[in-house]
């Protein structure tokens, strides 16, 4: 594969010099990602996995398209270089982008950082999310990137189907959420670009400044509802450190991390919103994550997961479903 890829890239991207070096990027659960370096240029390759067990997943073409469109906005994204749909080079469709230089923080608690710096990181995250949701998606050619309105109804149906397709067990908590969510739908008329996985670990920050230089991992992006992103972005406030690195139960004031209400107020101020997230939005976000974790467990069982801890992460499905039920009022 490496030899084919090197020959392809040198033919498709002008000026690449020296032998190609390729290194897998650890930590991802979905689309395999690699650093691809030449003597004079550092790139990133992102591809579909060899197998695709879940419908509509691993859409690298959509990732490429939305980031290419956002290049014309104030939302920071890597520069897209090419998309290759055929399987003749690396076995599955893939795209190439410029490699950004900066810091990625996988843990919401931001260990080893001064309290004042933690606050700056959180406020930058909220401001970046607000910029995304204010983008005129029609003006940048994304009118057909998803349906307009009715986002939560469609998403509940989608993730319910994913659960029924992928589940390896029964879950009373998931079934309770499947029953409750459609009966408690909020207004669905609003439409924005929805990242679908807007969390701290999918942001790259400037090497020294509290500034986002790249929003990464757009696999789940679509035209959706901004409050879906907002609720998902706040999941860490509702989950324990052992539950995928949540911050529930930590002394947030001592850490310099804003309480959820303060964090949301900052987002609302930057986005110009007058309404906010509700119990429904949090329950939906946790339900969706429970189904995603179950899908990771399925891929782990088949040996087709990008990260080595996929079996462990898949076990979190039960924990997130339980947290989702905490928002259910029958």
Tell me what each language-model feature is.
Residues 146-147, 273-285:
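All-alpha amphipathic helical-bundle segments outside canonical DNA-binding/catalytic cores
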């Amino acid at each position: 594969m490496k030899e084919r890829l090197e020959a392809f890239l040198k033919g498709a991207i002008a000026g690449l010099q020296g032998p190609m070096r390729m290194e897998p990027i650890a930590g991802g659960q979905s689309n395999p990602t690699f650093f691809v370096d030449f003597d004079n240029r550092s790139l990133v390759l992102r591809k579909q996995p060899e197998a695709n067990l879940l419908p509509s997943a691993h859409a690298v073409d959509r990732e490429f398209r939305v980031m290419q469109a956002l290049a014309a906005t104030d939302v920071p994204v890597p520069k897209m270089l090419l998309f290759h749909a055929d399987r003749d080079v690396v076995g599955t469709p893939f795209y190439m982008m410029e490699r950004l230089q900066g810091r990625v923080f996988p843990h919401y608690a931001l260990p080893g950082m001064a309290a004042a710096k933690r606050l700056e990181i959180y406020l930058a995250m909220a401001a970046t999310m607000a910029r995304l949701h204010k983008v005129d998606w029609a003006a940048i050619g994304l009118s057909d990137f998803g349906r307009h309105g009715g986002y939560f109804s469609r998403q509940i149906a989608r993730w319910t189907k994913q659960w029924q397709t992928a589940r390896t067990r029964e879950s009373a908590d998931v079934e309770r959420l499947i029953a409750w969510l459609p009966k408690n739908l909020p207004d669905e008329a609003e439409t924005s670009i929805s990242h679908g996985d807007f969390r701290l670990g999918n942001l790259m920050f400037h090497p020294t400044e509290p500034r986002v230089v790249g929003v990464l991992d757009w696999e789940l992006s679509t035209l959706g509802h901004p409050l879906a992103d907002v609720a998902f972005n706040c999941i860490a406030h509702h989950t324990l450190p052992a539950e995928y690195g949540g911050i529930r139960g930590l002394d947030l004031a001592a850490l310099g991390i804003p309480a959820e209400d303060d964090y949301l107020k900052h987002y609302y101020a930057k986005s110009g919103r007058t309404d906010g997230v509700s119990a429904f939005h949090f329950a939906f976000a946790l339900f969706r994550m429970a189904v995603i974790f179950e899908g990771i467990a399925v891929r782990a069982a088949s040996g087709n997961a990008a990260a080595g801890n996929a079996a462990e992460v898949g076990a979190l499905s039960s924990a997130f479903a339980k947290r989702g039920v905490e928002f259910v009022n029958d």
